[in-house]
Curated annotation (Swiss-Prot):
Protein's UniProt name: UPF0102 protein Dtur_1530
Similarity section: Belongs to the UPF0102 family.
GO molecular function: nucleic acid binding
Organism, as annotated: Dictyoglomus turgidum (strain DSM 6724 / Z-1310)
Pfam families (UniProt xref): UPF0102
Length: 118
């Protein structure tokens, strides 16, 4: 299983997680020239940008630890572009992280959803 496949498994799990809790997924893999946002969703008057981090082992630490300050700033800039291009207005904008650990077979062993992560 390559990194792209691992990432897709994590994003698929996150979309199911969000949908089952009343979120409406608006976009997946929203790309601009300098990066992307994994998932954009809404729940009521809240617009949520979700960074999904998925790993098969903890050799490099917990998945959430790889969301650096620079990555957070990049996501915020992409979010600004998204809101401006779509001309959206929400009462609140939130940045969440989904951290997922997979088994070698690609099954979700552990996950943690962090609302308002940054």
């Amino acid at each position: 299983m390559n990194n792209k496949e691992i990432g897709k498994l994590g994003e698929d799990f996150t979309v199911e997680f969000l949908s089952s809790r009343g979120f409406i997924v608006l976009e997946r893999n929203y790309k601009v020239s300098f990066g992307e946002i994994d998932i954009i969703a809404r729940k009521g008057d809240i617009l949520i940008f979700v960074e999904v981090k998925t790993r098969r082992n903890l050799d490099f630490g917990m998945p959430v630890e790889s969301v650096s300050f620079e990555k957070q700033n990049r996501i915020k800039k992409i979010a600004e572009i998204y809101v401006k291009n779509k001309q959206l207005r929400f009462k609140e904008i939130r940045f969440d992280i989904m951290s997922i650990i997979l088994s070698p077979k690609g099954e979700v062993l552990n996950w943690e959803y962090l609302p308002n992560a940054f």
